[in-house]
């Protein structure tokens, strides 16, 4: 277990991010942030996720008494389209049809914010994901599980959509929702863990 030098708060209610950070042996608390996740005009995918990650960390920092805050945001980018979480079944079906048989990228931005020093480390990590060709009935069956609705791009690589993925290039944990290697390095650089 990595020893935290001060309390660390994950500014996310995502069970996947909680599981990933726990797997690194880091002690932390969870307090969900509440920010507008809309895309700003002219914003690149990396700028978008880093801005939201930082906003989530700073939002939670204003409301709680910890020292170090981790914010994160994940999107899928396919043929220039930025995909967040689907609005409904039709949107999930549209996203999965678009991802079917072609590569796309998962982009996660994170921020490690030190409230005491008002310092922040941010970064965005890209992972290329290759989907197999999906049949319409596969897409409908997956949507019927309810799994797509709280996930960028309407799928969870660590869950029911694992069979859809032919290969990935880059960080697996990034696709799940938190680029663990980079986040742990940032926590060390910030002095949050030993």
Swiss-Prot record:
Annotated GO CC locations = cytoplasm
Q: What is its EC number?
A: 3.6.1.9
The reactions it catalyses are: dTTP + H2O = dTMP + diphosphate + H(+); UTP + H2O = UMP + diphosphate + H(+)
The record ties this protein, via InterPro entries, to: ITPase-like_fam (IPR029001), Maf-like (IPR003697)
Role: Nucleoside triphosphate pyrophosphatase that hydrolyzes dTTP and UTP. May have a dual role in cell division arrest and in preventing the incorporation of modified nucleotides into cellular nucleic acids.
| Name recorded for this polypeptide | dTTP/UTP pyrophosphatase
Subcellular location(s) per record:
Cytoplasm
NCBIfam families of this UniProt entry?
maf (TIGR00172), PRK14368.1 (NF010948)
